[in-house]
Amino acid sequence: MKRIYLLFSLLIGCIYLHAAIYNVMDFGAKANGKTIDSPAINRAIEAAAQAGGGTVYLPAGEYACYSIRLKSNIHIYLEQGTRIIAAFPGKEEGYDTAEPNEHNKYQDFGHSHWKNSLIWGIGLENITISGPGLIYGKGLTREESRLPGVGNKAISLKDCRNVTLKDLSMLHCGHFALLATGVDHLTILNLKVDTNRDGFDIDCCRNVRISQCTVNSPWDDAIVLKASYGLGRFQDTENVTISDCYVSGFDKGSVMDGTWQLDEPQAPDHGF
């Protein structure tokens, strides 16, 4: 009986631990759309990770950000009215530098790097990003993405496991809204993506479920399955289910605002 009670107590303790909420405002975030809030958000993520996991909560407001670095056992929740806005790089600050990859020559630059993104994680597990908020990649670009400090993707994940993206809206996402490479057990549910380059790039991934998503990407792939050599090893993409999704090629932003326009006269590689 004592052993059962001890196990029950440990279970409750673990549930309580992982239910801990870390409000980014308590870590110095201003949510005024001007202050760069990624350092405060990263402090909240680090505190949650140090405690074994928890929910990093972003209340309503505008969070100008450079790179947000994910950790294992973290749930990032964007409240209604929350906007994570990718800031334009400055002279002295910007996005994390793209990590070296000796296999660059086998696929383009965008598929070969993950850290030069608004939100990124490498070698992690048990990650959720959810909520009715918006990720707005305003300062992300495909052009000049090789330069230090430049960010070119909204969310990048490499060699991660047990990832859920749910209920988010994403606008103007640079080269990719999501680059998932070598991810096992990935769930993408009820996302609305309105961009003009790639929506979801599912690369060398296994056990993927994509459902109830709207992806507008007039100049590139909406949802694409592939197997590049970005990981430096051969790995198939397998066991993928895509259901109840809507993909389109309307002007960027016009699906989000409900106007559904087809007037944009720009070439695919310009206007970022």
What is each stretch, according to the model?
Residues I4-G13:
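Sec-dependent N-terminal signal peptides
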Residues F8, L17-F272:
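Extracellular/periplasmic carbohydrate-active domains that bind, remodel
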